[in-house]
Amino acid sequence: LVVLHLKGSHFNYLNRYPSDMTIWGKPGIPDSILNYENALHYTDSVLRQAFEYCKTRLNLQAMLYFSDHGDNPTRHRTPQFCDFIECRIPMFVYMSDEYIRNHNQRYESLISNRNKYFTNDLIYDLMCGIFDIKSNKFNENQSLAYNNYRFSREDLRTFQGKIRISDDK
């Protein structure tokens, strides 16, 4: 198991990528939106490099990527809940052909659950399910990798359980 923690696209976006990775705008010039886009592009580049390295050198079987929260580059983040854009996170799962052969039920469950609602509070159970992590805290009903995943839009909450996902219009 390899775990990478990326600082990703947190503010100050201009400091989240090397200047030679500037695609939009001019290197070193503050512009929240363009700097945010460049930070996202850089994160994608780092993920691509990690994926290629692990696939060619480490016999990569499965990979999970997710962000801790979404962001709106047009305003500063506050501790108060502002809007649902912060709840929308990028996430992907890669599985090798060998992994799919050996764990077909998990693959099929992820496919059938791909349009279901999910919050990053459930990442622990998803990781346990995908990576065979044994724990007495693991609940397969809370893992997208199992066919008995139980949550719907109406069930889930965010912001320490105070905001219902179903309130997102």
For each of these PLM feature ranges, what is it?
Residues 1-169:
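Catalytic domains that recognize anionic headgroups
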